């Protein structure tokens, strides 16, 4: 069975991490969780242990891109060949913020996209607010009647269930093509899923992303410099929904951490 490594990046804001962890209780069984913590000063690390999630900590804050790259390296390190000579462990890597809610079924829909289309990176839909600058990912672009329920975190599972209901109805009318994934020129980095083909775009043996972009620009630069020139566009899976609170962590809050390197914000 192909498995997925879900890497969640954290820096404080443990109240949102708790909400995220609670949503993970009902997701698919073939998903393992790894938390990369950027030197939180609250109870985030203790909470990870309470929920039974593996967590990698840092002695000092090194930024979001460092966390992404550590997650990617762990993904690569956990490939191995078992006694039967078959690849084992993870075929898929998800990198996600902690301020999200993942409904049951959303990851399966993303995985199904990889089995049908030749993509290396796929993203879910979210609310218009949650997708920020990339409105192509907004669920309201692809379905009618999802708002205002989709904007309420209490309905995140119901929204995913309604999407599957629509998918079933469209399949019965032979119009399933309407829900085919859409290639995009950009994607929002709050949640993205990759398959093993992503290794072809790595920055170095241990890094997928350009490390000089310490907090911002990382997904955009990766997309424009790596994926698009190879005609391997990030694509939105219209049948997957992940709720994103958005704007939970701000640079001003991060600077309060005494161990937070000021160089994080000097990404030129």
Question: Which residues does each PLM region occupy?
Answer:
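A conserved acidic beta->alpha catalytic loop
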Residues: 36-46
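Conserved donor NDP-sugar-binding/catalytic core segment of glycosyltransferases
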Residues: 101-151
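Glycine-rich, basic loop-to-helix element that forms the pyrophosphate-binding segment
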Residues: 59-85
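Short, acidic, metal-binding catalytic loop of nucleotide-sugar glycosyltransferases
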Residues: 22-31
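Short beta-strand-to-loop acidic/aromatic patch adjacent to the donor-nucleotide binding site
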Residues: 85-101
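A short, conserved alpha-helix in the catalytic core of glycosyltransferases
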Residues: 185-202, 212-240
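N-proximal low-complexity "stem/linker" segments adjacent to membrane-targeting elements
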Residues: 1-23
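A recurrent flexible, glycine/aromatic-enriched loop bordering the glycosyltransferase active site
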Residues: 156-165, 171-196
